[in-house]
Amino acid sequence: MNGLEEVKEVVIIGDGAKWVWNIAEELFPDAVFILDYYHFSEHVHECAEVIYPEDEVNRRRWIDSIIEGFMNGRIEETLSVIDPDAYEDEKASKKVAELKNYLESNKDKVRYKEYRDRGYFI
């Protein structure tokens, strides 16, 4: 007996690496999976640095709008404004596409409003 049968709920926080989720899902199929806020935020900040390398005001505004959207449960709406085609600069467009892919592939793990409402650490 390892004590897991007494646990009401298992919550796993990870960085978004597919191998982490694969192992976690295999071992704990009924767990709640959360993309940790640090890595979520890090990806958003890195993307904003490429979009607005010289414009701190718009960079901060963009970061805040993306993070606020996810934190307030507006996941689909926020994902829709992360649009690679909105950027003429190839490097910016590529970075936005990478961010969108990262967030879409972890969409079921970024329900931060729900997690905070349930008292989970993110």
What are the roles of these predicted feature ranges?
Residues 1-122:
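Catalytic center-proximal scaffold of phosphoryl-transfer enzymes
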